[in-house]
Amino acid sequence: MSEKHLFTSESVSEGHPDKVADQISDAILDAILAQDPHAHVACETVVYTGTVNVFGEISTSAYVDIAHVVRETIKKIGYTDSENGFDYKSVGVHVSLVEQSSDIAQGVNEAEEVRDKNGQLVDPLDLIGAGDQGMMFGFATNETAEYMPLAISLSHKLVKKLADLRKSGEISYLRPDAKSQVTVEYDNNGKAKRVDTVVISTQHAATATNEEIHDDVINKVIKAIIPAELLDDETKYFINPTGRFVIGGPQGDSGLTGRKIIVDTYGGYAPHGGGAFSGKDATKVDRSASYAARYVAKNIVAAGLADKAQIQLSYAIGVATPTSINVETFGTGKVSDDELLAAIRKVFDLRPAGIIQMLDLLRPIYGQTAAYGHFGRTDIELPWEQTDKVEELKAVLGK
């Protein structure tokens, strides 16, 4: 008997401690960008029982009441009761923010391409150098309507549904912290065939019984989100498998910005360069170039030029032009990868300033990305999720 071809991804809710930290960092970023679009921000957050620490490097003309932003973010997530060990009213907020290093700033504010010309700017998009070295990946597949791998897409939707049911009051015993995990079985041709296993752990009131949690999660969450044709009698369900999840959120575990980078991206289906997103402005290519790489990959697949596309970009700190661009279509390309790479160079400007201009990234749009994934979102409008380069790519390739 042959083994099944299985792939698993997970997601976490907005009340998960790491996601609380991400949302605080991005809320602070947005508050600063609303006043100063050209601010340089690298904001980290640690949350644990009764305490939030905010630290990092920021260069801005804006004034932001950091503690107020922190409390409002926690309130919006749903930590409003001191019985949970963490609530927006009583939490202690400690802020330690300093100015960005001048050594880094000189390379970001004036890229090597400008410095090599003794400050004489030829192309204004050469002005901004990458905020750091590193490699970033973008991915897209026609496996789902949102051009995302199925396992991570379903995982995000499950925890988002839990949050919606909690906030609407339909399931009154739900609390903010939750996790999901979905295992998808693929056929021998690499096509998603069925959902093999679903794991959901959700924080709950002490009065809730395991039976009602199990029934509600199966009927109001899983069956509401996962298409019936993907579920069968062999699908396995693990609902709160420890048997109890009353202590959760920052009371149960500490949380840190940037610790859910696989949840934020493709659920492990594609490589990750290692850099986190939240709390970083668009001069940080960890964030902006990852968004650009997704934008490129999604437009390639949406144009029908490949069934799957993976883009790798890399940068040197203080240099505008990428040090490398790589495209991989896993044998699904309708044109060669070399032809695609040439088309990418013509259609997309992948210098930091080019990305910022192309995707309009100086706006306070980041808080909405800090939970439920940065890619494949259908509930919010994100510039890197647009497929507005499809026709231009086709034209360049003569399609």
From Swiss-Prot:
Primary location group: cytoplasm
Subunit structure, as described in the record: Homotetramer; dimer of dimers.
Residues engaged in binding Mg(2+): 18
Classification via InterPro entries: ADOMET_SYNTHASE_CS, S-AdoMet_synt_C, S-AdoMet_synt_central, S-AdoMet_synt_N, S-AdoMet_synthetase, S-AdoMet_synthetase_sfam
Organism of this sequence: Lactococcus lactis subsp. cremoris (strain MG1363)
Similarity comment: Belongs to the AdoMet synthase family.
Pathway: Amino-acid biosynthesis; S-adenosyl-L-methionine biosynthesis; S-adenosyl-L-methionine from L-methionine: step 1/1
Ligand binding (L-methionine): 57, 100, 253, 284
A GO cellular component entry from the record: cytoplasm
Keywords: ATP-binding, Cytoplasm, Magnesium, Metal-binding, Nucleotide-binding, One-carbon metabolism, Potassium, Transferase
Organism lineage string: Bacteria, Bacillati, Bacillota, Bacilli, Lactobacillales
CDD domains in UniProt: S-AdoMet_synt
Subcellular location: Cytoplasm
Binding-site positions, K(+): 44
A molecular-function term among this protein's GO annotations: magnesium ion binding
EC number in record: 2.5.1.6
Major enzyme class: transferase
Chemical reaction(s) catalysed: L-methionine + ATP + H2O = S-adenosyl-L-methionine + phosphate + diphosphate
Cofactor(s) this protein cannot do without: Mg(2+); K(+)
Protein name per its UniProtKB record: S-adenosylmethionine synthase
Gene this protein is translated from: metK
An annotated GO BP: S-adenosylmethionine biosynthetic process
Function: Catalyzes the formation of S-adenosylmethionine (AdoMet) from methionine and ATP. The overall synthetic reaction is composed of two sequential steps, AdoMet formation and the subsequent tripolyphosphate hydrolysis which occurs prior to release of AdoMet from the enzyme.
Region (Flexible loop): 100-110
